[in-house]
Amino acid sequence: MRLNTIKPGAGSKSAAKRVGRGIGSGLGKTCGRGHKGQKSRAGGFHKVGFEGGQMPLQRRLPKRGFVSLTAARKVEVRLSELDKLPVDDIDLLVLMQAGVVPADALSAKVVLSGTIGRKITLRGIGATKGALAAIEAAGGSVATA
């Protein structure tokens, strides 16, 4: 096999639909658009959600709630990721420097995923019940604030 002989698998690629190339193609003359009307013209499509002048559904329904900007900056950290860190005293800054959480993270929470085999101390980081039990079983502790 050489680079110049590589081909896609048989039947994996279909030929492009060529329109306006004669009656025999089945897509000649009007190119599958039918006769006249807005949809047959170039640029003849209305915007998404347009209902012909009727008040659109997205404007008829009331607005509700909002998208929290801080929700995306709350990060989950696995227990197995903490086990790989070289330090025993772990806070949010340590996690950022190690690249475990992104630099714009506002808070972190440890979840029970994997195991921990050494004593660590968490400072200012939340932990689930399972993660807390695993950390304490390994001789570690969680200090709030």
From Swiss-Prot:
GO terms for biological process: translation. Coiled coil: none annotated. Keywords: Ribonucleoprotein, Ribosomal protein, RNA-binding, rRNA-binding. Residues 1-43 are annotated as: Disordered. Pfam families: Ribosomal_L27A. Residues 21-31 have a biased composition (Gly residues). The keyword Ribosomal protein applies. GO terms for cellular component: cytosolic large ribosomal subunit. It comes from the Bacteria. GO terms for molecular function: rRNA binding; structural constituent of ribosome. InterPro entries: Ribosomal_uL15, Ribosomal_uL15/eL18, Ribosomal_uL15/eL18_sf, Ribosomal_uL15_bac-type, Ribosomal_uL15_CS. Part of the 50S ribosomal subunit. NCBIfam families: rplO_bact. Binds to the 23S rRNA. Belongs to the universal ribosomal protein uL15 family. This is Large ribosomal subunit protein uL15. It comes from Aromatoleum aromaticum (strain DSM 19018 / LMG 30748 / EbN1). The lineage of its organism: Bacteria, Pseudomonadati, Pseudomonadota, Betaproteobacteria, Rhodocyclales.
